[in-house]
Amino acid sequence: MNPNMNMMPMSGPQMMQVMQSSPSGPPGPVQHQQQQPPQPLQQQQQAEKLDNISRVKSLLGPLRESMFLTIRSSAFALQQNNLADNLKRDTGAHHVPRFDKHLEDFYACCDQIEIHLKTAMQCLQQQNSSNHYLPGPVTPMRMETFMPDNAGPISYPTYLNTVRVHIQSAKDIHDTLISAAQNISQAD
């Protein structure tokens, strides 16, 4: 028995459809070929894993579940305490769900959501700052070509030179401020 064969019963039209969709070739020994998953799908899944907003969306289900368990365990604990206070029933025999454990799980989900939202907000602020101070898009390839005025994306070496100029300007301003502060302190 071949483990690669599906043992599902098929009707005539389904069998014909499978036969037509299978690659044409002589029936014989099955050749095992390694199939590689398409690269764009993998990159999309990796980008989705890295996206903070999608992480927040995936945490909403566990957050709802932990909130439900927390409220349910607190209601059960209140009911058991009320019965014990009224001396109606002995509460030692029943299994009481751990309210503190469920509350801790709820807060852990809230903390994870908060971290992902803060990270997404910081990424958005960084992107806005980047768009403000360097409005042209950057091509990811290293290529040395001439750049006509307003031709679109700037090359990576041009981007590196722009960053170097910005860093040097910031250092010059920093050094000027330090020397001015030292001159003021020496004058006093």
From Swiss-Prot:
Component of the Mediator complex, a coactivator involved in the regulated transcription of nearly all RNA polymerase II-dependent genes. Mediator functions as a bridge to convey information from gene-specific regulatory proteins to the basal RNA polymerase II transcription machinery. Mediator is recruited to promoters by direct interactions with regulatory proteins and serves as a scaffold for the assembly of a functional preinitiation complex with RNA polymerase II and the general transcription factors. Required for female somatic sexual development. Component of the Mediator complex. Self-associates. Interacts with dsx. GO terms for cellular component: mediator complex. Keywords: Activator, Differentiation, Nucleus, Sexual differentiation, Transcription, Transcription regulation. Residues 1-23, 30-43 have a biased composition (Low complexity). It comes from Drosophila melanogaster (Fruit fly). Residues 1-43 are annotated as: Disordered. Its main location: nucleus. This is Mediator of RNA polymerase II transcription subunit 29. It is found in: Nucleus. One of its GO terms (biological process) is genital disc sexually dimorphic development. Belongs to the Mediator complex subunit 29 family. One of its GO terms (molecular function) is DNA-binding transcription factor binding. Signal peptide: none annotated. It comes from the Eukaryota.
